[in-house]
Amino acid sequence: MKVLVTAKRVIDPYVKVRVKPDGTGVETANVKMTINPFCEIAVEQAVRMKEAGAVTEIVVVSIGVTQCQETLRTAMAMGADRGILVESADEVQPLAVAKLLKAIVEKEKPNLVIMGKQAIDDDSNQCGQMLSALLGWPQATHISNVTVNGDSAEITREIDGGLEKLTEMFRVKAQSGLRFALQGVIAKSRSAIACSTIAAVRSIHPLTLTKTFLHRIFQGGRL
């Protein structure tokens, strides 16, 4: 079984975020960046499934600047087999991300897509649901465990008041609510990453991408 996992590059959660003086965004220059923690959980889940013999290949995808290759290498050091980067110098909004991921899914043809439930920078929690709708796939959100049983997945979801257990036939899109080995980090740091651009993806899969314009961000306590 082939699994596709997404990984977003975000500001390290332990870094104090500073708003730019003109209010057009937050400072990212010379700021420590890392893989989104929820995406890290998703990669970990995929790796556990591979170790259990249920998964044969893990493909990790990131959309963003060239430096996102570092994020992909982190995921590959954890156990992912291949990395795909769709480069974009601009911030890509959730619906556009979902459309780009749909094109990649149609090309890679995974049996399962695992995504972090949300990114810690914008907390949108939108891409997974949008991707599921665009693909017409069943989905399970806020999951804590996935167990593969033949051609189906037994999923445990965290809900108000307890846990919900579902059985989904593939194909499925799941949102997951660490592992590092030095040898893996060294080996994967030399691995090739397939890089593309939004324009290249759109030339194969015609997409209409919308853009959200940010006017101003205010520091906490300032209105």
Where are these regions (language model features)?
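N-terminal glycine-rich FAD/FM-binding segment characteristic of electron-transfer flavoproteins
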Residues: M1-L223
